[in-house]
Amino acid sequence: AAEPGLSALGQFLKAVRATPAWVEACMRLRNRVVRWFGLKDLGGLSDLDPQRPLQDYRPGDRVGIFTLLENHPDEVLLGDRDRHLEVVLSVHTTGGGAAMPTGPVVVTITTVVHVHNWLGRLYMLPVAPMHRRIAPAVLRALG
């Protein structure tokens, strides 16, 4: 379940640390394929330093496949930009989190993708349906 008292970044890290092996296998396949098109190898979703304290994360740091853009107790913005698209992920917490310590924890994940060109549109054809399976599988760690 979502952990009371844990910041939005903490909730995100908890979820990605429990990334299923099949999701990481999909990321490895994705990274091999996109290199043929000159796109970035993002690594794995759970590529994190397990010893790094939560308070040591700063904007600009890599957090798995994303760059930390903004970090507030109740919301974290993560993103990545490549020549084909830009993505921003928001993890927002209410109730029981660091900003509001009473009540059940509700974690809301929102993703915005800006496609830059035909390559981005082509890329999203297989990626969008896969994300409908991957996102719930990763978020199961939060309950």
What are the functions of these language-model segments?
Residues 27-30, 43, 99, 138-143:
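Short C-terminal domain-edge/linker segments immediately following a structured domain
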Residues 55-101:
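Hydrophobic-ligand binding "helix-grip"
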Residues 83-125:
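Beta-strand/loop substructures that line and gate deep hydrophobic ligand-binding cavities in soluble
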Residues 11, 68, 109:
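Hydrophobic pocket/interface hotspot
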Residues 122-143:
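A conserved amphipathic terminal alpha-helix motif
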Residues 68, 104-106, 141:
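Hydrophobic/basic alpha-helical segments enriched in Actinobacteria
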Residues 44-59:
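Flexible internal linker/loop segments at domain or repeat junctions
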Residues 1-48:
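Hydrophobic ligand-binding cavity/cleft-lining segments
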